Amino acid sequence: MKQEINPKGTNRAIAFELWTKSPMPMVTFTKTFDVTRLCKVSRQRSMKFNMLLCWCIGKAASGIEEFYMLPKNGKLYKYDRMAINVIADNIKGGLSFCDVAVNDDLEAFNANYQQLTETISQTCHDILDDKAVIVGTSAVTGTELDSITNQYSGIFTNPFLAWGRYRKGWFKTTLPISFQFHHAQMDGSHAARFLEELQKTINTI
């Protein structure tokens, strides 16, 4: 459910006033994650690495209140559920998009992820959820990347995570992930907390 709320009645009142009309309100943090555990689970359970990472992102984000508030067109909206936007290659050689509902149950999330990505890949029709707050993702696995920035189009204000190919070392596998967020939605402290929670979730999946 999506509901317009008064920013003055939230903890985002000052930030909303300062940043909602900014020509560039987005901030990007980049953190290098230890994804050794994800690679192990992916192999052992025959689950896609990208799906596992998306599940961890949803798990970490869903526990932070600020993720459920989103500024758009000069207004602030509150949501009661969340989904992860996933991009998939389609049969026409282009890209298609789907929103996978956040779910604490990994098996259920995996089944939904597989069904949605397969459907959009074959039909070339996006499957989107306009009633959920969306956390965008993009896996650019054609190369290793240190950071991905400047994704702001002026239209989409939702949080967005992007990454390249993970890096295998002798003792661990690492992956730099860039996290972009609207400053009216959250402060650096909230973003840092999310990134810490994401690493903890990856470690304990």
Question: What does each of the following model-derived ranges do?
Answer:
Residues 1-16, 22-24, 37-41, 58, ...:
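Domain-scale detector for complete catalytic domains at protein termini or as standalone homologs
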Residues 90-145:
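Helical lid/core segments from catalytic subdomains that handle acyl or acyl-like groups
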